[in-house]
Amino acid sequence: MFTLKKSLLLLFFLGTINLSLCEEERNAEEERRDEPDERDVQVEKRLSPNLLKSLLGK
């Protein structure tokens, strides 16, 4: 029983580390892809629907 708990704890620990590393890698890739021009397009996309809603009064 003790070895089973020990094994499960080890698997949980290794899985947590793996998820953490994957998340850091994903965040780094997103930062590399974000160029100033792309950021401007994203802001415009978010701004356009809100601007239309305010102009139309909905």
Curated annotation (Swiss-Prot):
Organ and tissue specificity? Expressed by the skin glands.
Residues annotated as signal peptide = 1-22
Q: Any idea which UniProt keywords this protein has?
A: Amidation, Amphibian defense peptide, Antibiotic, Antimicrobial, Cleavage on pair of basic residues, Immunity, Innate immunity, Secreted, Signal
The main location is secreted
Region (Disordered) residue spans: 25-46
Q: What is this protein called?
A: Temporin-1Th
GO cellular component terms, A-Z: extracellular region
UniProt function note: Antimicrobial peptide that renders both the outer and inner membrane of bacteria permeable to hydrophobic substances of low molecular mass.
Q: Which organism is it from?
A: Rana temporaria
A biological process (GO) of this protein is: innate immune response
Query: Where found?
Result: Secreted
